[in-house]
Swiss-Prot record:
Belongs to the CoaE family. It holds the Pfam family CoaE. The gene is coaE. Transmembrane segments: none annotated. GO terms for cellular component: cytoplasm. It catalyses: 3'-dephospho-CoA + ATP = ADP + CoA + H(+). This is Dephospho-CoA kinase. Its EC number is 2.7.1.24. It comes from Gamma-proteobacterium EBAC31A08. The keyword ATP-binding applies. GO terms for molecular function: ATP binding; dephospho-CoA kinase activity.
Length: 197
């Protein structure tokens, strides 16, 4: 069974994923794969320079992610160009992960699962959800961005309603990490029972 794990920025996806890992479940972070797709030793890096030019590199010749983020949020066609570089790399990594995973079920953490229509590729979808204000506070403190930047990112992502509409299971992360862990344990038990039917 392959499960997609999603949620908006600052919802607690990574915390939930870590709890599944603690239970022995294989988890792939598609966002991390996407970030690594533009690292200096990757094929995506070369494609990136060809497409975007060296103006989006910092002094260390690494992709200047802040500058790039500003570009793609203001220019939809550039966002599409970037996706055309990154998405094939991510899809390949997900395929390899699924083939090689040995845990009873596997989880792929995909923040933009609704936006990319990739939710159709999974047996189940888990959404980590939390109140909007909590989401903004968490994301702005973690990512060193101001609240208006975080709100802008949230407005560009799928709405809570859209994410929840494709979800089989929802983890409500409005409380403590301990509470989130309990919810993950309940889901894990449910999935193990499903697999043993």
């Amino acid at each position: 069974m392959i499960i997609g794990l999603t949620g908006g920025i600052g919802s607690g996806k990574s915390a939930a994923a870590d709890f599944f890992i603690d239970l022995g479940i294989s988890v792939l972070d598609a966002d991390q794969v996407a970030k690594e797709a533009l690292s200096t030793n990757s094929p995506g890096y070369t494609d990136f320079i060809s497409q975007f030019g060296e103006v989006y590199l910092n002094n260390n010749r690494e992709v200047d992610r802040l500058k790039l983020r500003e570009l793609i949020f203001s220019n939809p066609s550039k966002k599409k160009d970037l996706e055309n570089i990154i998405h094939p790399i991510v899809r390949s990594a997900i395929s390899n992960f699924i083939i090689t995973s040995t845990s009873p079920y596997s989880i792929v953490m995909v923040p933009l699962i609704f936006e990319t229509n990739s939710y159709k590729n999974y047996d189940k979808i888990i959404t980590v959800d939390c109140d909007l204000e909590l989401q903004i506070v968490r994301a702005s403190s973690r990512d060193a961005q101001n609240k208006s930047q975080i709100k802008n990112i949230i407005n560009k992502q799928a709405s809570r309603e859209e994410r929840l509409s494709i979800s089989d299971d929802v983890l409500i992360n409005n409380s403590t990490l301990s509470d989130l862990k309990k919810q993950v344990n309940v889901l894990h038990t449910k999935y193990m029972e499903l697999l043993n039917e």
